[in-house]
């Protein structure tokens, strides 16, 4: 079975959220078999910075749903969207 790289957009609840701590919480929330290969940061507006983790997951039914659900439940996360997906 192959693997998929999914670049996710994670918006913090406010500019006051510590992004390093948020990144650690995201890594700890990952479902089994998933791992973060890199995390980019991008200024959005008014001091708000979005995290763009690239998550490597098995290519199976459900795709990124389990990662999206896990990230959505993390304290300090306002929203989670899939930015890009590709097989590796």
UniProtKB/Swiss-Prot annotation:
Signal peptide: none
Top-rank taxon: Archaea
CDD domains attached to this UniProt entry: EF1B
Gene Ontology MF annotations: translation elongation factor activity
Keyword Metal-binding carried by entry: no
Keywords per UniProt: Elongation factor, Protein biosynthesis
Entry-linked Pfam families: EF1_GNE
Keyword Transmembrane: no
Protein family per UniProt: Belongs to the EF-1-beta/EF-1-delta family.
Primary role: Promotes the exchange of GDP for GTP in EF-1-alpha/GDP, thus allowing the regeneration of EF-1-alpha/GTP that could then be used to form the ternary complex EF-1-alpha/GTP/AAtRNA.
Full protein name: Elongation factor 1-beta
Organism for this UniProt entry: Natronomonas pharaonis (strain ATCC 35678 / DSM 2160 / CIP 103997 / JCM 8858 / NBRC 14720 / NCIMB 2260 / Gabara) (Halobacterium pharaonis)
Name of the coding gene: ef1b
């Amino acid at each position: 079975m192959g693997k998929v790289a999914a670049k996710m957009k994670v918006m913090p609840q406010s500019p006051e959220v510590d992004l390093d701590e948020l990144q650690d919480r995201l890594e700890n929330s990952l479902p089994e078999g998933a791992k973060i290969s890199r995390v980019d940061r991008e200024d959005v507006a008014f001091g708000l910075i979005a995290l763009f983790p690239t998550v490597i997951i098995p290519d199976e039914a459900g795709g990124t749903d389990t990662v999206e659900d896990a990230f959505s439940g993390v304290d300090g996360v306002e929203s989670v969207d899939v930015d890009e997906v590709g097989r590796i």
